[in-house]
Swiss-Prot record:
This is Serine/threonine-protein kinase StkP. Disulfide bonds: none annotated. GO terms for cellular component: plasma membrane. Residues 364-659 are extracellular. It catalyses: L-seryl-[protein] + ATP = O-phospho-L-seryl-[protein] + ADP + H(+); L-threonyl-[protein] + ATP = O-phospho-L-threonyl-[protein] + ADP + H(+). The gene is stkP. It comes from Streptococcus pneumoniae serotype 4 (strain ATCC BAA-334 / TIGR4).
């Protein structure tokens, strides 16, 4: 634990502890380099700092997060190591997590839930295009800023933690409520697993609770692939069917029925509150699968020892064929109740055995495997003896420099310690060749010539120092903008690892961002700051009932385009504006009351612009009081503010009797 008030990593003054996860602590700190800007510093716990697998995965996942630059993803600002402690710094979000927000405001309105889920989907779209699957999406990992902006956090870190200690089932309890059916069955998490979790989160926003709960992780996991999703509308009647259908499709148990991508889900979500989908039917999938009824695999004797004692004893007492427990020969007329009780008891025992076997099948996907022993720190001879004793074969020996592990001792195994493998599998040993490394410094902001000279002094070969130029309006030419290896990385001189320095040069081009969904005023200001001439920014308005006025609907050129500010290339932004004209519906045959209500409440025609007249002639079969004529006709465009609508109601002539 870091002392409050301490300056950590020579840069961060620790203010207070604000979080404590399964394997890391989170502190609020002030970045002294950035004039005291508040950041959140996440530090890997001391007991995991000596675990090379945990450290390597922490660093790898942190770098992956650093590449995700998106307004709805918590931004990583720094990664490093201080006194043997792995850490990462990220933007501090001064707000609530979505779990707490739901608890205080449930159920969320349809509009707010759609807005928040839309932001989450945009964040995950970027992650998925970068090949990153979150695997642990839940409301606790979604932060809300004071203005209601959603930001996704903890990309992959939770997964790296869980893989280091597979026996810590408590770490699963926090996210099993959002676990996809395929993950519950033991399959690898995919993009569609993230989509399932977002569907469960969406359900929770609109109802105030999770759909599946129970006393244990096993009970909850079983429900994910056995129990149908409870109806959202039954609990929250204000939810339209089109919106519930988004949740139904996102949480489909079969992958073939589920959204294939977050983009597909985002498009469907965007129109879920549209008037055009008001009469949509409920989605119903056939979720039955042969996999649900297949024969249970044979359970080994070693696996049976893991069943709780009560279950194991019950299995020994069960009979071979319960259906033959009572026959004509064994029937005793003097005590029928006793035998009926015995029969029920035997059936109950058989059921318990079946349930136990089912749980073993679910929780032990590879019942014949055993965990690889942890031989880190042992000599090669000791490690070989330990592995052979566990019935593993010895594979290749590889050497690797290490700052912490003594020469000739084991750094790690491949596959890693704790990983399940079958007996007889060859296990490779990674042996320390001693110290042959140095710590990478922070080169950003320094002159590239000085950095190159420093690296050469540390014996880094010329051919491993690569310079890449990048245009910049903000930094002086020749200044290092980025470095491929973060500050604090241990650089091994025995490996041909390239160091890439991105150096500033005078800018003439910019990368266009994704402006769709953003406010046009903000985007125009941003483009001007990037030296795009105002006369080259063209705004085209387009009516929309789905997008908020002033929001960008389309852009040209598209996101990611390299734009040369020195050339007169026009940027066109299509901006949403309020709908002022619609196609006239047909009211022929409708009642006057229905027609007026529909025109005023649904179409948006002002009551003062509606004229009702009575006519005495009408087509045969017309009922009195029904609309027989309308102007404008059905399908014609009407201006909601100017067009006058004329409705003709059939009123037959009354004939008086002749005296």
């Amino acid at each position: 634990m870091i002392q409050i008030g301490k300056i950590f990593a020579g840069r961060y003054r620790i203010v207070k502890q604000i979080g404590r996860g399964g394997m890391a602590d989170v502190y609020l700190a002030k970045d002294l380099i950035l004039d005291g800007e508040e950041v959140a510093v996440k530090v890997l716990r001391t007991n995991y700092q000596t675990d090379p697998i945990a450290v390597a995965r922490f660093q790898r996942e942190a770098r992956a997060m650093a590449d995700l630059d998106h307004p709805h993803i918590v931004r990583i600002t720094d990664i490093g190591e201080e006194d043997g402690q792995q850490y990462l710094a990220m933007e501090y979000v001064a707000g609530l997590d979505l779990k707490r927000y739901i608890k205080e405001h449930y159920p969320l309105s349809n509009e707010e839930a759609v807005r928040i889920m839309g932001q989450i989907l945009l964040a995950m779209r970027l992650a998925h295009t970068r090949g990153i699957v979150h695997r642990d999406l839940k409301p606790q990992n979604i932060l809300l800023t004071p203005d209601g902006t959603a930001k996704v956090t903890d990309f992959g870190i939770a997964v790296a933690f869980a893989e280091t200690s597979l026996t810590q089932t408590n770490s699963m309890l926090g996210s099993v409520h959002y676990l996809s059916p395929e993950q519950a069955r033991g399959s690898k998490a995919t993009v569609q697993s993230d989509i399932y979790a977002m569907g469960i989160i969406f359900y929770e926003m609109l109802t105030g609770h999770i759909p599946y709960d129970g006393d244990s992780a096993v009970t909850i996991a079983l429900q994910h692939f056995q129990k149908p999703l409870p109806s959202v509308i039954a609990e929250n009647p204000s939810v339209p069917q089109a919106l519930e259908n988004v949740i139904i499709k996102a949480t489909a148990k079969k992958l073939t029925n589920r959204y294939r991508s977050v983009s597909e889900m985002y498009v469907d979500l965007s129109s879920s509150l549209s008037y055009n989908r008001r009469n949509e039917s409920k989605l119903i999938f056939d979720e039955t699968s042969k996999a649900d009824t297949k024969t249970l695999p044979k359970v080994s004797q070693s696996t049976l020892t893991s069943i709780p004692k009560v279950q194991a004893q019950t299995e020994h007492k069960s009979i071979k064929n319960p259906s033959q427990a009572v026959t004509e020969e064994t029937y005793q007329p003097q005590a029928p109740k006793k035998h009926r009780f015995k029969m029920r008891y035997l059936i109950l025992l058989a059921s318990l055995v079946l349930v136990a076997a089912s749980l073993i099948w679910i929780l032990s996907r590879t019942p014949a495997t055993i965990a690889i022993p942890d031989v880190a720190g042992q000599t090669v001879a000791e490690a070989k003896a330990t592995l052979k004793k566990a019935n593993f074969e010895i594979g290749e020996e590889k050497t690797e420099a290490s700052e912490k592990v003594e020469e000739g001792r084991i750094i790690r195994t491949d596959p890693g310690a704790g990983t399940g493998r079958k007996e007889g599998t060859k296990i490779n040993l990674v042996v320390s060749s001693g110290k042959q490394s140095f710590q990478i410094s922070n080169y950003v902001g320094r002159k590239s010539s000085d950095v190159i000279a420093e690296l050469k002094e540390k014996k880094v070969p010329d051919n491993l120092i690569k310079i890449e130029e990048e245009e910049s309006n903000e930094s002086e030419a020749g200044t290092v903008l980025k470095q491929s290896l973060p500050e604090g990385t241990t650089y091994d001189l025995s490996k041909a690892t390239q160091i890439v320095l991105t150096v500033a040069k005078k800018a003439t081009t910019i990368q266009l961002g994704n402006y769709i969904g953003r406010n046009s005023t903000e985007v125009i200001s941003e483009l001007k700051q990037k030296k795009v001439p105002e006369n080259l920014i063209k705004i085209e308005e387009e009516e929309s009932s789905e997008s908020e006025p002033g929001t960008i609907m389309k852009q040209s050129p598209g996101a990611g385009t390299t734009y040369d500010v020195s050339k007169p290339t026009q940027i066109v932004l299509t901006v949403a504006k309020k709908v002022t004209s619609v196609a006239m519906p047909s009211y022929i045959g409708s009642s006057l009351e229905f027609t007026k209500n529909n025109l005023i409440q649904i179409v948006g025609i002002k009551e003062a612009n509606i004229e009702v007249v009575e006519v005495t002639t009408a087509p045969a079969g017309s009922a009195e009081g029904m609309v027989v004529e309308q102007s404008p006709r059905a399908g014609e465009k009407v201006d909601l503010n100017k067009t006058r609508v004329k409705i003709s109601i059939y009123k037959p002539k009354t004939t008086s009797a002749t005296p």
